[in-house]
Amino acid sequence: AIMAVQATATVMGALGFTNHVVAQIIALILVVVLAAGSGILGFEAIMKVQTWITWATAVLTIVYLVLVAPTIDFAVLSSRPSAPLTAVLGAGCMLLVGFGFGWINAAADYSRYLPRAASTKGVVGWTTVGAALPTVILVFFGILLVGSADESLSEAIGGDPIGALTTLLPTWFLIPFALVAILGLIGGIVMDIYSSGLSLLATGVPVSRPVATAIDGTIMTVGTIVVVFFADSFLTPFTAFLTTLGAVIAAWGGVMLADIALRRKDYDEPSLFTPSGRYGSVNWGAVASLIVGSLVGWGLVVNASASWLSWQGYLLGPLGGREGDWAGANIGILLAMVVGFVGYWATSAGRVRAQEKLPSRTYAQGADEGEQ
């Protein structure tokens, strides 16, 4: 939502709209109405919106790549000095959090919309290709563009990533560019708001689905207002958010991967719906692994430009401290996943084996036990 608002306001300015603050307000209202409105309307509306967004985004993205390709200068790129290992690791971990880990918690949300008859291999294969292929192409192309330009483009991207890229475009393509940028971002927002609304309902909050979706949309709006109108730049809160939340998601992902690796049978679905089932209410081994993994992750990342996160990096002493070369490597993200995986395996392997020895039950049995 933040990038969609910034991109819209920047394009409006390029087209002659001189009041940037008013442009941001108009852009915010437009994004919120389109995204939250579609999410509240429900699944059928989302599917119709997503179909058009997908095709429009694909076509306009290809046109954009063709238009800016001449600005790539391989002579300049080859003259760039090589980055140190720690910088490469840091950039790789940020990409991992921003793209790869973003699918860990979203996988179940997107999968819930698929028919039960869908092939497991097909779901995994097409999800992997659909998520990875565009990301690899666009990130690689973006590296070529930024590496070919002077430092002013990199600085501009730190404040407004998508809007900065308009400087490479002819004026006649600004409106189509705005469409591809905004529609692509809104497409993701729509799905995420709808899914997060369902997740909120799963926690037991006694509200209807549209109300739950509206709550999440409100949170999104408040966060967007804070970053767009009060933050010094986009990059500072963005990287702070990625590394801080990324450590938790990485640890949680490690727990999930360990659980998948340990199990030889499918989950007994009726038992998932009752605290008296074989899985119980809480797996304290998983909780402990998540907490310890998160703490290890936070201890090995830093956010130098975000003063409110100065407490992070408390485990970097042996690696040169918060100002050393390894401070920006973000290895805490990787180690958080390792700790989550190893911790869950060590604490829950026996528990999983015991669960799989029990006989399966019917939904009726699960419901009866839940009522008791």
Regions found by a protein language model. Name each.
Residues 5-9, 55-80, 96-102, 141-151, ...:
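Hydrophobic alpha-helical segments and their helix-loop junctions in multi-pass secondary transporters
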Residues 14-40, 55-66, 93-107, 179-182, ...:
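Transmembrane alpha-helical segments of multi-pass small-molecule transport proteins
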Residues 1-17, 186-202:
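Hydrophobic transmembrane alpha-helices that form the core helical bundles
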Residues 56, 253-342, 357, 361:
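C-terminal membrane-solvent junction of multi-pass transporters and transport-like membrane proteins
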Residues 41-54, 105-137, 152-163, 192-211, ...:
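Hydrophobic, small-residue-rich membrane helices and short re-entrant helix-turn-helix hairpins
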Residues 141-189, 206, 225-244:
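TM-loop-TM module centered on a large, flexible mid-protein loop between adjacent transmembrane helices
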Residues 26-68, 125-127, 238-250:
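Membrane-interface loop-to-helix entry segments
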